[in-house]
């Protein structure tokens, strides 16, 4: 059996991560990013580990750390491999990250890019969990955080360029089944 081939989708994500790292204030944070364990970690291979923070399975703490790092002047790329994990951080996301600029009277505009994956049913169907897309549900609760669905390779680099020049948080939704050719 041969190794899976990279697709234009995965290549665009990898290039976007390199682009993010051009800013010396960028920090990556998440589960299984320093130590390979999910498909997203494939997109950051070879990038400086000293600018990555490996977290345990503590999604709400990860979001809180992302907010704190952003308040300290960092651009944060926070990795959530699936929406089901981001749900666990909903309190920090909805009640803090979304409202921080307003709560601080504009003093803090947190530059947080949230990478979240829509779970796949390939090669195995995980059942009811880990494959839903909650973009619409979160979109109805978030008033100041745009959600962009990266449903084609052509959308990825422009979305990351927009995120890097914009002030404030953004959620970029990935489709991991598009990482590899079948």
Per-region residue spans from a language model:
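Thiamine diphosphate
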Residues: 1-182
